[in-house]
């Protein structure tokens, strides 16, 4: 599902909101989440999951075109850990 598909679906379900209002709300929510992670803080949405930063240590990688070794710096990357309710709903698909 793309962001525009999500906006369309939410606007249909919430008839009191226009698509523009839903779009503004989603954009603001995503911006707030990005700002929170950028500040190094964790985001927890109970029943859904949590977003945090994980550190990737420096390592030696390879240039896919030339095959030469390249030293990659350590960096923080966003990480999502699904909550119990979300895991259970997804697991139900497999049974």
Swiss-Prot record:
SMART domains: BHL. GO terms for cellular component: chromosome; cytosol. The keyword Ribosomal protein does not apply. Keywords: DNA recombination, DNA-binding, Transcription, Transcription regulation, Translation regulation. InterPro entries: Hist_DNA-bd, Histone-like_DNA-bd_CS, IHF-like_DNA-bd_dom_sf, IHF_beta. Pfam families: Bac_DNA_binding. It comes from the Bacteria. SUPFAM superfamilies: IHF-like DNA-binding proteins. CDD domains: IHF_B. One of its GO terms (biological process) is regulation of DNA-templated transcription. GO terms for molecular function: DNA binding; structural constituent of chromatin. This protein is one of the two subunits of integration host factor, a specific DNA-binding protein that functions in genetic recombination as well as in transcriptional and translational control. Belongs to the bacterial histone-like protein family. Heterodimer of an alpha and a beta chain. PANTHER family: DNA-BINDING PROTEIN HU, INTEGRATION HOST FACTOR SUBUNIT BETA. This is Integration host factor subunit beta. It comes from Shewanella halifaxensis (strain HAW-EB4).
């Amino acid at each position: 599902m793309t962001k525009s598909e999500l906006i369309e679906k939410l606007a249909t379900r919430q008839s009191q909101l226009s698509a523009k209002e839903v779009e503004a709300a989603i954009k603001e929510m995503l911006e707030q989440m990005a700002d929170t992670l950028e500040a190094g803080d964790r985001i927890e949405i109970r029943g859904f999951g949590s977003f945090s930063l994980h550190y990737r240590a420096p390592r030696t990688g390879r240039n896919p075109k030339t095959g030469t070794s390249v030293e990659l710096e350590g960096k923080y990357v966003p990480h999502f850990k699904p909550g119990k309710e979300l895991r259970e709903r997804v697991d139900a698909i497999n049974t």
